[in-house]
Amino acid sequence: MLRFFSIALLLLCFSNANAQPFPFQKGDHVSILGNTLAERMQHHGWMETMIHSRLPGHELSFRNLGFSGDELTLRLRSSGFGSPEDWLKQTNANVIFAFFGYNESFAGEEGLPKFEKDLDSFLKETLSKKYDGKNNPRIVLFSPIAHENIKDPNLPNGIENNKRIDLYTKAMAKVAAANKVFFVDLFTTTLNLYSVSEKPLTINGIHLNEFGDKLVAQIIEKQLFQNEGDKKDAAFL
């Protein structure tokens, strides 16, 4: 019971770098880009559910374009698959959720200058487009989650990995602020969640299980909405 209370309290008491809630608009088409964290979110659907519960009258649509291994400048696809821009146009994206930074973090501290430059270019270029044919998109940039130590002798404990992810999360926050882009720090909050949860949030330290997916969705919900607005229950939806 104490651990459950600690998790609930922690979800309420996170820090938020954004001054205002994210400005969703009725009929928004949300396209989700990024690495395995983004791709695996389609398995349980908690993030979309949490957002719909806040905005049941907005008629939002979500399209998951996440792809394992994706980086800002490296997105391997079969020939004829179409470019990232093609798919953002096909989905009429006017809101983009971008999950990057984990794969890039393996370049270490020496890779930070290139990463910051690539991220700045990605944000500026993306913000300049009109994928829905009318408006420049609004972006939410998400940091990687922390690496969880699930105490399996066959898996790394995540200490070195988290040092790198921490550096890249801070770099992402800086670049997002410079471009006036909404930023969600998943690293710091998940690192704290791991310490108070009695159950693992991941299957292997880095990929969320359903319990972890739900808690991360709650983090995202609270950062996007900053506890403003009514939340509808499952029966209403």
Model feature map: region roles:
Residues 12-15, 51:
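Structural signature of transmembrane alpha-helix termini at the membrane-water interface
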Residues 17-21:
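Boundary at the C-terminal end of the N-terminal hydrophobic targeting segment
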